[in-house]
Every structure is written in C-alpha cells, then in structure tokens.
C-alpha cells in the first residue's frame, strides 16, 4: 500500500469509515517525496528516538521508522487509531500514544519512552496548533532538533531577521532557544484536501545554551521582548512605557534606551537578541535599585 497514493488513501479511509476533520486541521500527503525528504531532513538514525505529533495515516511515520531506532507518535483523533493499526502493523519500532500533545507531560514522555537514545521531533503539524506546540517542545528542553512542516508564513516568521516585517516576539523566542532554518516549500497540491496556503519545512537545531545570557533572567528578558512588540507601530519608548511606565517614568525609560545605544524612537523590530538582552538588563537594574 502506498500511503501517498490517492486511490490507496481513499480505499484505506473507506475501509475504516474515516472522514476528515476541519477542526483538527487534517491534510494528508499525496506526494511520496515530501515525507521522504522531511524524514531525511530530520537527521534521524539508529541513535535517535523520534517524537511525531499528528501522524495521520502514517506516511512520514513509515519513513521515520526506517531511519530511527524508535518512533513514538501522539495522535488525538480516535478515528485514526484503527487506520494506524493497519498501516503501521509491520513496524516493530513504532508506538502510538493516544491523546492531545498539549495535555501531555512532554519531558516525562521523553524520559519514559526514549531512554538511552537521543530525542528528536519530526512532524507535519496542524496549522492551528503550531505556535503552542513549538513553544511546549522548546520548553521541554529534551530534544536535539525539531523538524516540522508548518505554514510557510509561520516558518518565515520564526527564522526572520531584525528589521524585517516577519520579525517579532516569537522569532526571538525560537532564536533564543534554537537555530531555525527554512529548508524547502511544500505546495498545496501535495495534500488531500489541499490547504489554501503553502507549507514549509523548518528545522530548528536546539541550542545547548541560549543564544544570549541576560543577567536579569529569562522571564524578565521575554517580558521586555513582549512589551517591545505589543504594539508594532509604536516606538520602543512608547511600547516600554505601556508596561514599565508606571514604575520608571518615560524620561527614565528614554535614558535607559539611550544608555543601550539606541534612539528612543526606534521600533522594537530593529533590535536583535543581544540588544534586547542589554536593554532588559538595564531595565531590571533600574527597577531593582
């Protein structure tokens, strides 16, 4: 059975009475090269255990099972369990975990299932859960790399550089923890049903240490980042005033920004990780005098 052949897919789904769920963002691959190239991009080999989220009917799962020592897939849709039981019947290194990835303890899952192996993530993520899932995976601090197919617009935002329209708070979060790289596009016609947008494969190599080490700590660092991007059209001074103005005052904030070497009228999107680290540290020092 070819899990990327439309006739085989329809016959398989028909046998199990499966119907696509719009609420779950289900789009199944119908081009063989896509799951093959995604699995290859993940870098999985016999030293790795792979966590897959939303395996669907299993085309990427099969490719991963051929490469990795172990593949553990989390699937929410109960209607797909009997489908996967059929398509993955011959894969001894495959484990299905029924459930919602956002409700699972990811570090505990990895520690239980991946002992002695290097954990990776490789998945075709539903568009509607991309940001919270990536956040949870990064914060789990368990994975060597995270390779996902997501909406191209989101992939570009994650990998965006300072001063570009795509750059924002989530760019900084992902780049603080990982080294993201957009690898290749996947057009809508590669899916059944076809989505309205182009997808892209993004690989994020997880940093052993964060890209910068703000003395103020991660929590305050990202509080500063979120404040700077809360209203993109505002200057950095006005954005920070909305959050810190009650404690520091606008004149003090302007002096802090200038001490960091920036014009108070600059927008937050112009600052990189190191600039935000310097700014957050100065704000923190002033607040804790």
Language-model region placement:
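Catalytic cores of RNA-modifying enzymes
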Residues: 1-227, 258, 267-269, 278, ...
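C-terminal lobe and adjacent flexible extensions of AdoMet/dcAdoMet transferase-like proteins
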Residues: 227-289
């Amino acid at each position: 059975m070819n899990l990327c052949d439309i006739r085989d897919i329809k016959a398989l789904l028909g046998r199990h009475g499966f119907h696509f769920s719009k609420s779950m963002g289900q789009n199944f691959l119908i081009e063989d090269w896509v799951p093959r190239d995604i699995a290859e991009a993940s870098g999985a080999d016999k030293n790795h255990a792979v966590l897959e989220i939303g395996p669907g009917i299993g085309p990427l799962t099969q490719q991963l099972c051929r490469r990795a020592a172990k593949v553990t897939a989390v699937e929410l849709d109960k209607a797909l369990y009997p489908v996967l039981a059929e398509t993955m019947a011959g894969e001894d290194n495959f484990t299905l975990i029924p459930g919602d990835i956002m409700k699972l303890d990811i570090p505990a899952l990895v520690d239980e299932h991946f002992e002695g192996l290097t954990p990776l993530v490789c998945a075709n993520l539903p568009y509607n859960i991309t940001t919270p899932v990536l956040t949870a995976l990064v914060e789990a601090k368990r994975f060597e790399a995270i390779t996902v197919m997501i909406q191209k617009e989101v992939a570009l935002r994650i990998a965006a550089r300072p001063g570009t329209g795509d750059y924002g708070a989530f760019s900084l979060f992902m780049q603080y923890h990982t080294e993201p790289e957009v690898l290749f596009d996947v057009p809508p016609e590669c899916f059944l049903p076809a989505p309205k947008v182009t997808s892209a494969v993004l690989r994020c190599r997880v940093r052993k240490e964060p890209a910068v080490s703000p003395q103020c700590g991660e929590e305050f660092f990202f509080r500063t980042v979120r404040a700077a991007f809360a209203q993109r059209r505002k200057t950095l001074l006005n954005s920070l005033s909305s959050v810190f103005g009650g404690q520091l005052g606008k004149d003090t904030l302007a002096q802090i920004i200038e001490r960091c070497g920036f014009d108070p009228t600059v927008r937050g999107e112009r600052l990189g990780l190191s600039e935000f680290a310097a700014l957050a540290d100065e704000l923190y020092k002033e607040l804790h005098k």
